[in-house]
């Protein structure tokens, strides 16, 4: 409150471990359920498909947790489909590979499923070779609810400002693109509708003041 920053917590299962370990994490979280808004799936994606965790995600939903998962960053586009169809996630974390499948793009648009992209992390992990190759601009042009995030700033060289700045510089993003990215972030958030509207209105007012 002192810094006027609000937050919601997402607990993550580590995909390089087995589902049994994820169930242990779930059980450990239950006494603190009132503090946790959702569960996710992260760590090494290659060789660890979302389908490994169907049962624990189903049980997590039974406990009222919202569901998200890392998919389609280092792993194939099939992992995005698995996260959507098998884990029933409401958002895809990363999701860079979605553009490989036009039918998937249509699904994301129809269901208003957004992506949390981490450009500097993608560069550091060699998901992209250059920032100019990042897919976020094409995603925005297709109407996908793309957003920009920092992943693990201490490891990957940048907090939110650096990610926005380097992406905008590399892709020549204009003010409309930047405004849409900020609006998308609030649209995808788990804030109450009136709070979302308030923040989105502030974003629009700021960008309008620049004209």
Per-region residue spans from a language model:
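Mid-to-C-terminal alpha-helical segments outside catalytic/metal-binding sites
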Residues: 172-211
